Amino acid sequence: QAATAHLPSAAQVDVLRGPLAQLYGNAAGGVVQVTTRDPRPGGAAQAGVALGSYGQRLVDASLDFGDQRLGVLVDLSHFEIDGWRAHSAARRTHFNGKLVARPDGRTRITALLNLYDQPLAQDPLGLNLTQFQSDPRQAVAVATTFDTRKSVGQNQLGVVLDHQLNSADSLQLRAYGGTRQLTQYLSFSGAAANSAGGVVDLDRGYHGVGMAWTRALRMQSGLPLTWTVGLDANRMSEHRQGFVNQSGVSGDLRRNENDRATNTDLYAQLDAWISPRWRAVAGFRASKVRVEVDDHFITPANPDDSGARTWRHTSPVAGLVWSATDSLNLYANIGRGFETPTLSEMAYSSGNSGPNFGLSAARSRQWEVGAKYKGENQQLDVAWFDTRSRGEIVPVETVNGRSVFQNVDNVRRRGLELAWRAEMGAWTPRASYTYLDAYFGNPYTGAGGAAIAAGNRLPGTARHTAQLAVDYAPTTRWRVGGTLNLAGAVFANDTNTASAPGYAVAGLNAGYQLGDAAPGSTRWQLWARLDNLFNRRYAGTLIVNDGNGRFFEPAAGRRLMVGVRAQFL
């Protein structure tokens, strides 16, 4: 779950895309990898507070202690917001802890503890076009009638052991476990005898282990070659219940089942320099995924929905990189992947009945070619990609917050990605652009028997998006910056009869620093940001194929946030 990533203590965020991301496993068309920073040797502490428009309140604090042999980082934050829209308040508390131990020069042990508590996240629901245009801050009537909201609690612990066996071989062992509790009140009662209920209650436990062996050596040519083999095994058990929503109060039982999902993956990767300027990468991942449902709510109106599905697939990938110059690399990658439906995607079938065991895994073929240039003061990335999938898992309908999915063949995504960054003295400009041509290659029948024509665009995808930003730091104390985000129109349904218009949204930010980074000193940071500078009205997200026509989730208007942070070094 992306919400549990704790960005205040992150050292870096990496976005891995393209065919080589398939090596990360099932559904890895892309990977967002958040790495928590290591504890600072010698110790440090910091605390901050921020206030913003619409009742935004944020406090956070972190503490580092220990040395190079044993270090600990603890980070705690709390956020609240009254909400820009009616019925959109939320609050959450997040703890992130990291321990790094180096018992000897060849061994590193890393432990991560993440605790996430979100007791309240009100849902104002989507708006239809008339509501969106007349008053984007409103909540629809059923949101207050049924008190639509969600609470989430997730705790997880992971341990990684890295050990250098000898000069060529290294071993990594991983283990993790966690729990997740979710209660969600939807915008209908779910009182019918064959309904799954209008209140979702999940209690989930999950754990897994993994190992990887890496050998780094040199070929007879003297060029490096590295190979890795590994094994992952994961298991998730879930108790899913559904209750009648009695105007925001949980009522009679309507669903009761135990769900299980397991996967076992074997993978290997080879990385070799075949000449001083040519590098080849190849690998595969063989996966077995099984999903089981054990139904315990069986009545004459609600028959036994127990069942199971198993999927097996091998995802091969290959890539080639040419170092044309010391600053320019050209590359090409190709691969195949697959995506099994999640328990959430299988949870409902048409007619508001039980699990959708007819949902199949999606299979894709993708390739990309690109170039990466890194000069003395600027860098440029260019990539052209093409992905074609069979059995694409798409939402056929979403009614009252509940989504039903189906498979669609010959879904195509192709496009161009550009990213540029430069350092020009005190100025740091950045720009990125994406052209995405995503469409259904075959006709199919959607919700309510609607005919979806070949060539219709995938809903929720903009053909053009761009980001422009510039930072200016005239001194080591001052910094100011501006951003501009642009996006084209986006269709909201498979029939392409409803759409959200494109938008251009600007923002400003500034910061001032007091003190220096000398050990034993205190450094103060003052910052401010102004989002949606010109108070543009636009849809931040869409509820694709909403059965009630409430597709649009408005983004917040102009908003200001200011904060102060103290660092004790």
Model regions: which residues?
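Transmembrane beta-barrel wall of Gram-negative outer-membrane proteins
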Residues: 53-80, 85-123, 148-167, 279, ...
